[in-house]
Amino acid sequence: MSASQDSRSRDNGPDGMEPEGVIESNWNEIVDSFDDMNLSESLLRGIYAYGFEKPSAIQQRAILPCIKGYDVIAQAQSGTGKTATFAISILQQIELDLKATQALVLAPTRELAQQIQKVVMALGDYMGASCHACIGGTNVRAEVQKLQMEAPHIIVGTPGRVFDMLNRRYLSPKYIKMFVLDEADEMLSRGFKDQIYDIFQKLNSNTQVVLLSATMPSDVLEVTKKFMRDPIRILVKKEELTLEGIRQFYINVEREEWKLDTLCDLYETLTITQAVIFINTRRKVDWLTEKMHARDFTVSAMHGDMDQKERDVIMREFRSGSSRVLITTDLLARGIDVQQVSLVINYDLPTNRENYIHRIGRGGRFGRKGVTINMVTEEDKRTLRDIETFYNTSIEEMPLNVADLI
């Protein structure tokens, strides 16, 4: 939906968007209290019960246009309250008496979809809204039964399973009025682009589209042209994407084979509350986990080759704090809200510099302090400088007293 819906053709892309994703906001209205957003009483109760006191910057700007039904592009870094922004907007617009799916949220990973579902259910706790996670790796027959019997108000899912359910007509698009793409930079990367298009073809042409992302590479902008109408743009400039409260350091390990000893030394010198170690390949996650276990370090590991049940158990243990150190690939870097993480170690620098912000955003959500340590070989030095330039940030050599900072 848009302010001038009828006068707009889908081929005319959003204005104010340059190829490199240097984008201007076109919405300046700020509402700095949840009480002033005209939200329902039961939704407000859920918001305050969840622990929110004051809307974050993105919530102050984006909730209102979302509720008014505009198409919205919202750019904010990890940990700023993006999920609650669209969850609140959806819950305010749901007709509770209509037992039909009215909002569809897509996320790039199963874990993120489940995280979003939890937030929606918690915020909507006093409303009686239903929300179902429609994700791969789960029983299809049980899914079909759930969709047919209940027709949940809100579906949160991954593109493959959602399209399958739409295609087989177990999920009806008839009453879907809001379509949300979370972590759109990842969603619209080549792997998911076609599925997004396919899903969009199934939805009504007047469905409201809300797109959220930490970064706005040109391929995302290209796709927004195809399915967004005169969107409200609420954005932070790239150089503002440095994550406040996160101290960033590097260790010059010189050679790849010296990383393992360096990591073990860190274990002995740091009293870690909880830490995530990022690695670029699934195979290397398994390799490092084995090496750490062989040296009697307790670590858990998670990557995309594991089945869903195993991944769920590992995430549950890590969230509860019973496991303290998690080795993973970028799978976890997309929006998983692990509150206690105070330390992120990039054992490998990310191959895609735009993933850097997703990884280190794990370390200090909503202003919580965090430390990031990047292990850098001679070959990595240029990549590190590239990341510094891209985010307009400074990454210093790790001081000897790093334990005091965590």
Swiss-Prot record:
N-acetylserine: residues bearing it: S2
Start and end residues of each Helicase C-terminal domain: 245-406
EC number: 3.6.4.13
Top-rank EC class of the record's enzyme: hydrolase
Modification N6-acetyllysine occurs at: K118, K174, K193, K238
Ranges spanned by the short sequence motif DEAD box, renumbered to the chain: 182-185
Claim: Oxidoreductase is one of the keywords in the record: no
Extent of motif Q motif: 32-60
Subcellular compartments: Cytoplasm, Perinuclear region; Cell membrane; Cytoplasm, Stress granule
One GO term describing the cellular component: perinuclear region of cytoplasm
Keyword line: Acetylation, ATP-binding, Cell membrane, Cytoplasm, Helicase, Hydrolase, Initiation factor, Isopeptide bond, Membrane, Nucleotide-binding, Phosphoprotein, Protein biosynthesis, RNA-binding, Ubl conjugation
Span list, region Disordered: 1-21
Modified residues (Phosphoserine): S4
GO biological process: cytoplasmic translational initiation; positive regulation of transcription by RNA polymerase II
Modification Phosphothreonine occurs at: T158
Residues the entry annotates as binding ATP: A76, Q77, S78, G79, T80, G81, K82, T83
Entry's Gene Ontology molecular function annotations: ATP binding; ATP hydrolysis activity; RNA binding; RNA helicase activity; translation initiation factor activity
Catalysed reactions, as listed in the record: ATP + H2O = ADP + phosphate + H(+)
PROSITE patterns the record matches: DEAD_ATP_HELICASE, HELICASE_ATP_BIND_1, HELICASE_CTER, Q_MOTIF
InterPro entries the record matches: DEAD/DEAH_box_helicase_dom, EIF4A_DEADc, Helicase_ATP-bd, Helicase_C-like, P-loop_NTPase, RNA-helicase_DEAD-box_CS, RNA_helicase_DEAD_Q_motif
Pfam families: DEAD, Helicase_C
Quaternary structure, from the entry: eIF4F is a multi-subunit complex, the composition of which varies with external and internal environmental conditions. It is composed of at least EIF4A, EIF4E and EIF4G1/EIF4G3. Interacts with PAIP1, EIF4E and UPF2. Found in a complex with XPO7, EIF4A1, ARHGAP1, VPS26A, VPS29, VPS35 and SFN. May interact with NOM1. Interacts with PDCD4; this interferes with the interaction between EIF4A and EIF4G. Interacts with RBM4. Interacts with DDX3X in an RNA-independent manner.
Protein's recorded name: Eukaryotic initiation factor 4A-I
Organism (species): Pan troglodytes
Recorded name of the encoding gene: EIF4A1
